[in-house]
Curated annotation (Swiss-Prot):
Belongs to the prefoldin subunit alpha family. This is Prefoldin subunit alpha. Molecular chaperone capable of stabilizing a range of proteins. Seems to fulfill an ATP-independent, HSP70-like function in archaeal de novo protein folding. Coiled coil: none annotated. It comes from Methanococcoides burtonii (strain DSM 6242 / NBRC 107633 / OCM 468 / ACE-M). GO terms for biological process: protein folding. One of its GO terms (molecular function) is unfolded protein binding. HAMAP family: PfdA (MF_00308). Keywords: Chaperone, Cytoplasm. PANTHER family: PREFOLDIN SUBUNIT 5 (PTHR12674), PREFOLDIN SUBUNIT ALPHA 2 (PTHR12674:SF4). Heterohexamer of two alpha and four beta subunits.
């Protein structure tokens, strides 16, 4: 194999490794975004249930590390919703559901963009693999 061909092969191998790492990173981001979508979905469903409940609601609230506490929710007229940058605002249940639905839609768009990025990376990987596979032996 000539020195130029060896250098080309090393460059292609390096590009391939970098693209694989990029794909792993995008997959991790995709997983986190999908978890956020699931969180929004759970919150929306919970708020819809709370809206339809009457009187005090007995529930268990997670404290973390598998610990729960019994609690009574007496008032569901105001929901505190994070709006970003460490800021939270009070909203009605309907407004909170609207906010979470919008957030979920925005996250869905992020998923689409990340999937597009993964597709592009996959195409570039396939192109490199094809180029390496089509090289005549030296």
């Amino acid at each position: 194999m000539s020195e130029t061909s060896e250098q080309d092969a090393r460059n292609l191998a390096a590009q391939h490794r970098e693209l694989q790492q990029n794909a792993e990173s995008v997959n991790q981001q995709l997983g986190m975004v999908q978890m956020s979508i699931e969180d929004c979905t759970r919150a929306i469903l919970t708020l819809e249930e709370l809206k339809s409940a009457s009187g005090a609601i007995n529930t268990m609230i997670p404290l973390g590390a598998g610990a729960l506490i019994h609690a009574n929710i007496a008032d569901v007229d105001k929901i505190v919703v994070s709006v970003g940058a460490g800021i939270s605002v009070e909203k009605t249940p309907t407004e909170a559901i609207e906010t979470l639905t919008q957030r979920k839609e925005e996250l869905g768009k992020v998923v689409e963009r990340l999937n597009g990025t993964l597709t592009q990376i996959g195409q570039r990987l396939a192109s490199i693999e094809s180029a390496v596979g089509n090289r005549p032996p030296q």
